[in-house]
Amino acid sequence: MSKIMNDIIQSLFPGNCFEELLINFNFFHPTCPKAVLSRGLGFAITLGSILLFVPQILKIQAARSAQGISAASQLLALVGAIGTASYSYRSGFVFSGWGDSFFVAVQLVIIILQIFLFSGQTMLSVGFLGIVSAVAYGVVSKSIPMQTLTAVQTAGIPIVVVSKLLQISQNYRAQSTGQLSLISVFLQFAGTLARVFTSVQDTGDMLLIVSYSTAAVLNGLIFAQFFMYWSHSESAAKKKRN
């Protein structure tokens, strides 16, 4: 039990920060306050990400439809999330720095399965699940080399851009955000903004910093579209009810 508590303390208070801040009350330490804030933010983002897409999943399930949600956008977002989680896991970064990517990937898998199933593509959903399982095994067993994961993470930046632009474009053409969940999109936007700070503080890895910065800007645009097309989405919903 004491080992578990020690691991938790070390996760939140790197180095000698526990002693500096909570024993010596050295709140003006040059690095510890920022380091602990970053770790705390990281854990908060990771915990929040467990439910990030639950509103979206429930909305699709209730409507029995994924209308307005770009399958290509979700697939590319999944590649980006898996790339970040796999690269960070194999690089040995603390879980609080990438755990959200893992949980986001799991939820994106569910959303993509919903898109396939509600469009009658059952066999496609089975094949998709098989591919995801094989990739997960390859990462954990180290069958996939680190060079490949680095390449995927590097490619993740344009992948994120294309993924978000596809959804932005679909919203623009429809003048509506369809079945997109406002709560999920807002949490994505806030989470990627916070991740820019935690990536700078915890890893200093430019691949992650640029990736999260790009995602934050594009998530902000999608969030703004809810307010731009609010009246269109409301009128479309009323027509469907009538």
UniProtKB/Swiss-Prot annotation:
GO biological process entries: IRE1-mediated unfolded protein response; oligosaccharide biosynthetic process
Keyword Magnesium: no
One Gene Ontology cellular component: membrane
Localization, UniProt: Membrane
Transmembrane segments: 40-60, 68-88, 98-118, 120-140, 148-168, 180-200, 207-227
Membrane topology: Multi-pass membrane protein
Domain PQ-loop: 37-95, 152-202
Principal subcellular localisation of the protein: membrane
Keyword line: Membrane, Repeat, Transmembrane, Transmembrane helix, Transport
Family classification: Belongs to the MPDU1 (TC 2.A.43.3) family.
Protein name: Mannose-P-dolichol utilization defect 1 protein homolog
Organism: Caenorhabditis elegans
Gene name of the encoded protein: mpdu-1
